[in-house]
Regions:
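Catalytic loop of the DD-peptidase/beta-lactamase superfamily, centered on the K-T-G motif
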Residues: 1-146
Length: 146
């Protein structure tokens, strides 16, 4: 069945994807050059759904292997608004998006973390890589406060 996909067909290299993500994590700056103002990055990564609602309240999860509870939407990214409700490891305020063939990235500003996962699994729910990847990444962190 046909459908409109505004983000469909985007292509990048892993290196360019990382450069873009690092620029976002650094508040719009990369290699000493400002591409976006910090305010623009803040606006992009804030939940803009009406009334602060979540994706779970407004849509169905057609392609994502993870649910949308505790997740809002910014200007181009899903945004975690309630990490407990999302039932995914992460932080409130982390932002992410996935693509075709199970590609996925997320940025966690609180942990100064970027994760980019490029694979080719179709359909996207062939294997639950997003949940498992997040679990593995966050479980590898050491508690430096102990």
């Amino acid at each position: 069945p046909g459908f409109i996909s505004g983000g469909g067909g985007l292509v990048s290299t892993a290196r360019d994807y990382l450069a873009f993500a690092a620029m976002l994590l650094n508040g719009g700056t990369a290699n000493g050059v400002r591409f976006l103002s910090p305010k623009t990055v803040q606006l992009m990564t804030a939940n803009h759904l009406p009334g602060g609602r979540t994706l779970a309240e407004l849509s169905t999860s057609m392609f994502s292997e993870v649910g949308y509870a505790g997740v809002g939407f910014g200007l181009g990214f899903s945004v975690t608004t309630d990490v407990a409700a999302s039932m995914l490891p992460g932080s409130n305020g982390d932002y992410a998006w996935g693509g075709a063939a199970s590609t996925y990235f997320w940025i966690d500003p609180k942990e100064e973390l970027i994760c980019i996962f490029l694979t080719q699994l179709l359909p996207s729910d062939t294997y639950p890589v997003r949940r498992e990847l997040r679990t593995l990444v966050y479980s590898a962190f050491e508690d430096t406060n102990a």
